[in-house]
């Protein structure tokens, strides 16, 4: 049932051990050499090797959860990572401020080290492709103005296509267009229901 590829065992136990071993070496998280190869070793995205991307310093929760994640995973080898994360979030909330204080201090120390090492650092979150598409779509359709009489969106015409609420629709007939035009049809025909 377990796969062995190129002589390596991919059983759940081995995968769990590999995950746990990764967190044991703090040198993997913070390296002195900021080369692209180090970013691949630290869990960064190797596809970004051409860019000089600097990771954010760890916050107090991340500092605390590194060791806790390892402990929870050892106690519950079958527990999924998402479930471990939920449990860690709950456990962190249950800690008192006094219990959290050493981790806040460590996070502050790491921030200071990070600031010294990267003085011009500014956090620039990476946008996912889907988010960029949604933002472009919102900008495109932000020019659509509400119709004063009906409260609906006025159709937006772009190169022979009509869009309403960001979705293409069939072109209006002359009669439909006349009914939707505020100056002529909608105000004069108030006794008739508007077409839906």
Curated annotation (Swiss-Prot):
Where does this protein bind DNA? 54-122
Q: Which GO terms describe its cellular component?
A: cytoplasm; nuclear speck; nucleus
Keywords assigned by UniProt, alphabetized: Activator, Calmodulin-binding, Cytoplasm, Differentiation, DNA-binding, Nucleus, Sexual differentiation, Transcription, Transcription regulation
Name the InterPro entries for this protein: HMG_box_dom, HMG_box_dom_sf, SRY, SRY-related_HMG-box_TF-like
Q: What is its main location?
A: nucleus
Q: Which GO terms describe its molecular function?
A: calmodulin binding; DNA-binding transcription activator activity, RNA polymerase II-specific; RNA polymerase II cis-regulatory region sequence-specific DNA binding
According to its UniProt entry, one GO biological process term is: sex differentiation
Give its localization: Nucleus speckle; Cytoplasm; Nucleus
Output compositional bias ranges, type Polar residues. 181-196
Q: Note the superkingdom of the native organism.
A: Eukaryota
Which residues belong to the signal peptide in this entry? none
Q: Where is this region: Disordered?
A: 33-52, 164-196
Assembly, in brief, is: Interacts with CALM, EP300, HDAC3, KPNB1, ZNF208 isoform KRAB-O, PARP1, SLC9A3R2 and WT1. The interaction with EP300 modulates its DNA-binding activity. The interaction with KPNB1 is sensitive to dissociation by Ran in the GTP-bound form. Interaction with PARP1 impaired its DNA-binding activity.
Family, according to the entry, reads as follows: Belongs to the SRY family.
Xref: PANTHER family: SEX-DETERMINING REGION Y PROTEIN (PTHR10270:SF161), SOX TRANSCRIPTION FACTOR (PTHR10270)
Protein function: Transcriptional regulator that controls a genetic switch in male development. It is necessary and sufficient for initiating male sex determination by directing the development of supporting cell precursors (pre-Sertoli cells) as Sertoli rather than granulosa cells. Involved in different aspects of gene regulation including promoter activation or repression. Binds to the DNA consensus sequence 5'-[AT]AACAA[AT]-3'. SRY HMG box recognizes DNA by partial intercalation in the minor groove and promotes DNA bending. Also involved in pre-mRNA splicing.
The name this protein carries in UniProt is Sex-determining region Y protein
Q: What broad taxonomic lineage does this protein's source fall under?
A: Eukaryota, Metazoa, Chordata, Craniata, Vertebrata
